[in-house]
Design a protein with these regions (language model features):
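Short pre-active-site segment immediately N-terminal to the catalytic Zn-binding motif
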Residues: 194, 291-314
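Bacterial Sec-dependent N-terminal signal peptides
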Residues: 1-24
Length: 412
């Protein structure tokens, strides 16, 4: 089901709509409007603050199906033309802030998290509405603001001071292809040759998997040599703090392997002037870990033996919006998905609205739920355990890339 979902996303990106669909050039110019927000709050109350607007030299995102939402995500952005009220662009995302809200710390303290989104640059004034949803899929925060394209305080970025970079795969221009940037984290200036080699391995790992393998000619991959003062990344549990480009660290939410960064603006600043839609950050460390957040970033360790499968797994989160299919009895995120709500992620189900998921891919004889003993007979089934919970959440295959590193492929 992972594969089917990613193929659907490709269709959204490349197939032009009906004759009545809006043309990109009706409302937009070939530039990017970058919006930096702060998501703030605690377990009880959340809000969204506007931070800064920037203009980037080109638009690398989709030019078709502009007003359609490929996936719901945990948050949505809708851009409307002020004059007509028409929806001219929409996108969705998930955020580290929303994951943090499920932790015990969020019951005690109010925090703020940086979040950055890229939108096509409007020709005329546009209203941008951003909405966060909780895990019951209810609106938890909302902000509307008008962007005037000729506002002198919109910061023009990416014209100078562009980070050194090399293309590992160039299949076409940014208009025709999905642009993925691989960023260096914890590599000093003298370690950049190692970074370029690591980025090439990540690239090769990604395209050894379907459906990416068949779609390779639709991708551009650029390795961006963002330098760090220190080598390696921070590991708070070991008391090791490093001065790096994006301040990445293990032990996010006190979970050993959860490697993330909260410096989202610094990440996007390092990419200004380079066309990008998706971000993979490689951390120069042998310690095991990673993280992937839908339409935000993938972060993974480059020198652990499982680097290849982990980068593919995490890209499944950030590119495909896929959920984790693994579960532990004591998982810190256990309870993230309420069992009486159908999750928006396409590869897990609570069976509240299973018809919206992979029900149509099951054979008539498939038992629901599917016993583990029958896993060989039913490659696609409804296997209990997923989304960090052993009970009440189901996954489409006994094993796949979103569950274990050992499994060679995504589910069908």
């Amino acid at each position: 089901h992972d594969m089917k979902l990613i193929l659907t996303l490709f269709t959204c990106l490349f197939v032009t709509g009906c004759a009545y669909a809006q043309n990109f050039s009706d409302y937009f110019t070939n530039k990017t409007l970058r919006i930096d927000y702060l998501f703030t709050g605690n377990a009880d109350k959340q809000s969204i603050c506007l931070d800064e607007l920037s203009e980037l030299p080109v638009w690398a995102g989709r030019r078709h199906h502009l007003s359609e939402l490929p996936l719901e995500g945990n948050g949505q952005i809708v851009m409307r033309d002020v004059a007509s009220g028409k929806v001219i662009y929409t996108t969705s995302f998930s955020s580290l802030f929303q994951e943090w809200l499920e932790t015990d710390e969020a019951k005690e303290v109010t925090k703020g998290f940086e979040n950055t989104y890229l939108l096509p640059y409007p020709i005329k004034p546009a209203e941008v509405e951003i909405t966060l949803r909780n895990n019951k899929r209810e609106v938890s925060a909302n902000l509307k603001h008008v962007v005037k394209p000729d506002d002198i305080l919109i910061h023009k970025k990416g014209l100078t001071h562009i980070t050194p970079h090399k293309y590992l795969l160039k299949s076409g221009n940014e208009e025709q292809c999905i642009d993925v940037a691989i960023l260096a984290e914890g590599y000093t200036t003298s370690e950049m040759e190692t970074f370029y080699k690591d980025a090439a391995i990540a690239c090769e790992a990604l395209f050894s998997h379907e459906p990416f393998q068949s779609m390779k000619n639709r991708f551009n991959i650029v390795a961006v040599a963002s330098p760090s003062a220190d080598s390696g990344v921070s590991a708070p549990k070991q008391g090791a703090w490093k001065h790096t480009a994006f301040g990445s660290h293990f032990d996010t939410f006190y979970s050993d392997r959860y490697l993330t960064t909260s410096r989202v603006k610094a990440i996007n600043d390092a990419l200004a002037g380079i066309p990008y839609e998706h971000i993979i950050i490689l951390a120069n460390t042998e310690q095991y870990g990673g993280g992937g957040i839908y339409n935000a970033f993938t972060l993974t360790t480059a020198h652990h033996p499982n680097f290849r499968p982990v980068v593919v797994h995490e890209f499944g989160h950030s590119f495909g919006g896929l959920a984790d299919e693994y579960f532990y009895d004591e998982d810190v995120m256990n309870g993230l998905y309420p069992l009486n709500i159908e999750p928006w992620e396409q590869n897990i189900t609570t069976r509240i609205n299973f018809a919206s998921k992979w029900e149509d891919m099951l054979t008539k004889a498939t038992p629901v739920p599917t016993p583990v003993a029958n896993k060989a007979k039913y490659p696609i089934g409804v296997y209990e355990g997923g989304g960090y919970s052993a009970k009440g959440i189901y996954r489409p295959a006994f094993d796949c890339r979103m569950r274990t590193n050992e499994y060679p492929t995504f589910c069908p």
